[in-house]
Structure formats: C-alpha cells, structure tokens
Amino acid sequence: MTFTASSSSCAITESPVVVALDYHERDKALAFVDKIDPRDCRLKVGKEMFTLFGPQLVRDLQQRGFDVFLDLKFHDIPNTTARAVAAAADLGVWMVNVHASGGARMMAAARDALAPFGKDAPLLIAVTVLTSMETSDLRDLGVTLSPAEHAERLVRLTQQCGLDGVVCSAQEAVRFKQVFGAAFKLVTPGIRPAGSEAGDQRRIMTPEQALSAGVDYMVIGRPVTQSVDPAQTLKDINASLKREA
C-alpha cells in the first residue's frame, strides 16, 4: 500500500504507537512498512538503519505517509548538536532526540535551532537513562542514584531547557506526569504486549499499562515487526488502547 506523504506539522494518526524499525536490509524494512497503515502508527529510525541507508530511507517512509521519529540521540558540543537537530528538521521528521546528559547549554542550543521552523518543527525530546540500564550500571559510571532518581534529575533539566519531553521508562511515567505536567511528552521504549519476551529491555510494560501510567508515545519493536500479521497486530494494540482509555 502507498500513501501520500504528510508534513511534520500535520500528523495523520492519533495512535501513540511508534514502531521501531530494526532491519539490516532496506528492502526488508520497506517490505514490512508496505504491510502496515500509517494511520495505525509512526515509525522510528535508529542509528544502525540511518547509518546504513541515510536520509533517503526517511524520505522513503515519508513518501508512504509515515511520521518518522529520528532516534539518533545527539550528544555533542552545543553548536554541532544544534546543526544536527536543524538538519533533522530540514528532513521533515516528526520527532528527534538528544542526550540530556549533554547538559543545559547543548539542549538549549538544540531548542533554539528549531525556532525558525515554527509549527513545522519536530518534537524535541531528551534521553535520560537508557531502559537497559540498572542501578549497578549507573554505579559503574560513578552515579550513586537509582535509575529513577537520576532520570528525574535529567528530566527536570530538560524541562527547564524548554524541550518538549523525554524518553523514560514506563515505571517512571506516573511520577513524571505528576511532577512535570500533562503537556510534557513522555516517550517510552520497552513496551511489549502481554506474552512477548523482554529482549534487551529491562524495565518493560504492556501498552495498556503504559497508557495508564501516562505515556504519550510508546515504542514497540519486534512484537510488531516479527508478527506474522503486523497490520492486524497494530490494529489489536490500538483497539486495546482505546478500550483502556
């Protein structure tokens, strides 16, 4: 199926589902995408696929009608990060992210770089603590806080810098919504329908649990991309979310 591309300022789906594309071959990725409907989800392109296939892959997805979350987690000096974020906006992506650990000046520079794009600017979110990390991993880095405590500190900094939201674990979402407000977007990986394997994500929830926790956008990968009927899987997930709402 082929759909007309939409601009980043005019989303064609209200679904909170973002499907993570993790393919080694471009043709297989596009074959999967052609099985699903852009009204049922958005798509996430990460570092591996973007490194392999570049901006043209994003354009291919947009031409099929999908909003794209460019998940490159920029983390560099402020000027370099700002230029990278502006380049992502030029590409027309729906969402782009940076590492909150890059600091306030870096995040503010990224925010300012999007000002010229006005209503067409992508959502700018920050990564706090990767969902694969546990307390022991943070301790190895010299951080004595728990993942939730460290993440909350970074979330506070992110909001102070004027970004649109953060990537966080579903377990952290309840408190973050209470503390940082409904308008501050929460994007959560590690979301898997009941019965799915945990994979390399440590802090996981089902889509229904994530919605109840206050998650705005939930990233789902293999349970959809490896489904024998991904279109139906997406429809089932969205139907369950509507019942939960």
Curated annotation (Swiss-Prot):
Single annotated GO MF: orotidine-5'-phosphate decarboxylase activity
Catalytic activity of the protein: orotidine 5'-phosphate + H(+) = UMP + CO2
Gene Ontology cellular-component terms listed: cytosol
Record key words, sorted: Decarboxylase, Lyase, Pyrimidine biosynthesis
Top EC class of this enzyme: lyase
Xref: Pfam families: OMPdecase (PF00215)
GO BP term (any one): 'de novo' UMP biosynthetic process
EC number: 4.1.1.23
Active site: 73 (proton donor)
InterPro entries, A to Z: Aldolase_TIM, OMPdecase, OMPdecase_AS, OMPdecase_bac, OMPdeCOase_dom, RibuloseP-bd_barrel
Residues annotated for substrate binding in this entry: 22, 44, 71-80, 131, 192, 201, 221-222
HAMAP family: OMPdecase_type1_B
Protein family (similarity comment): Belongs to the OMP decarboxylase family. Type 1 subfamily.
The protein's role, per its UniProt record: Catalyzes the decarboxylation of orotidine 5'-monophosphate (OMP) to uridine 5'-monophosphate (UMP).
Quaternary structure (record): Homodimer.
Protein name: Orotidine 5'-phosphate decarboxylase
Organism, scientific name: Salmonella choleraesuis (strain SC-B67)
